[in-house]
Amino acid sequence: MPELAVQKVVVHPLVLLSVVDHFNRIGKVGNQKRVVGVLLGSWQKKVLDVSNSFAVPFDEDDKDDSVWFLDHDYLENMYGMFKKVNARERIVGWYHTGPKLHKNDIAINELMKRYCPNSVLVIIDVKPKDLGLPTEAYISVEEVHDDGTPTSKTFEHVTSEIGAEEAEEVGVEHLLRDIKDTTVGTLSQRITNQVHGLKGLNSKLLDIRSYLEKVASGKLPINHQIIYQLQDVFNLLPDASLQEFVKAFYLKTNDQMVVVYLASLIRSVVALHNLINNKIANRDAEKKEGQEKEESKKERKDDKEKEKSDAAKKEEKKEKK
């Protein structure tokens, strides 16, 4: 397989925000299932840095994938204006909101190659169902068939990640300040991340199973590169039938369960101590409150007796006069 022109795509938060805004605006006007736009950025060796984007008018027939329209005149005018602002940002590819590849993506990508020979497609999921990266990057390659038929264009997956400069990080933190739940601890976050990771693994395994079933039934041609990579994955799996592996697994599990048990005991003892301390504090507070009430009653009684004695003295003085 030929070496890819790009090995990693870095998408900036500004691009994600622009795409979501584009999707929300178009969704209110019409019922388009996806929106399309152009990606701007720069190349650094084999890393593509996508720092900006703009929307492009796009429409397609829901029934016939071969019928679609992309306004390239609007594209050229918008790119001319963006180039005046920042000449270093060039057209590096295009995006759509998918959430999966479409049959006419190859044809659209061929059109985008007029402006960028190594055009990259980034699918941005604006309504993700699970936590994780909302981006999937692809680049078109020539696929050679084993049966001698002519080569055809297909998409090759490229690693993607979210990256930001310092100013963008400050802006994103400011936007997320009111969304973050400060009551959630690190433990719950770790457990949530592991659960979502297992869900993602399950989804990938189902995709692999579906692919292998289609290849076995003859619905898809054999791609030796994919088969070799799957074989490498299977070779890395541990042999669960080995007695040593089973013993090591049980020992590791028992150690972890002992730690969990001790943590539960310590938590119970601490809670019991807190309960006792709370009861003692409440008892002392009640005693103090009772003493204060008794003292206030005694003071009021003394004041009344003093008032009576003063009144009696005044009466005696009047009688003497």
UniProtKB/Swiss-Prot annotation:
Keyword annotations: Acetylation, Isopeptide bond, Proteasome, Ubl conjugation
GO terms of molecular function: metallopeptidase activity; protein homodimerization activity
Family membership noted in the UniProt record: Belongs to the peptidase M67A family.
SMART domains: JAB_MPN
Residues with PTM N6-acetyllysine: 204, 214, 313-314
Other facts noted in the record for this chain: Does not bind a metal ion.
Source organism of the structure: Mus musculus
The organism's place on the tree of life at top rank: Eukaryota
Subunit structure: Component of the 19S proteasome regulatory particle complex. The 26S proteasome consists of a 20S core particle (CP) and two 19S regulatory subunits (RP). The regulatory particle is made of a lid composed of 9 subunits including PSMD7, a base containing 6 ATPases and few additional components. Within the complex, PSMD7 interacts with subunit PSMD4 through their respective MPN domain. Interacts with TRIM5.
Cross-link Glycyl lysine isopeptide (Lys-Gly) (interchain with G-Cter in ubiquitin), where in sequence: 180
Location of the region described as Disordered in the Swiss-Prot/TrEMBL record: 281-321
Gene name per UniProt: Psmd7
UniProt GO cellular component terms: proteasome regulatory particle
Protein name: 26S proteasome non-ATPase regulatory subunit 7
Functional summary from the UniProt entry: Component of the 26S proteasome, a multiprotein complex involved in the ATP-dependent degradation of ubiquitinated proteins. This complex plays a key role in the maintenance of protein homeostasis by removing misfolded or damaged proteins, which could impair cellular functions, and by removing proteins whose functions are no longer required. Therefore, the proteasome participates in numerous cellular processes, including cell cycle progression, apoptosis, or DNA damage repair.
Residues of the MPN domain: 9-144
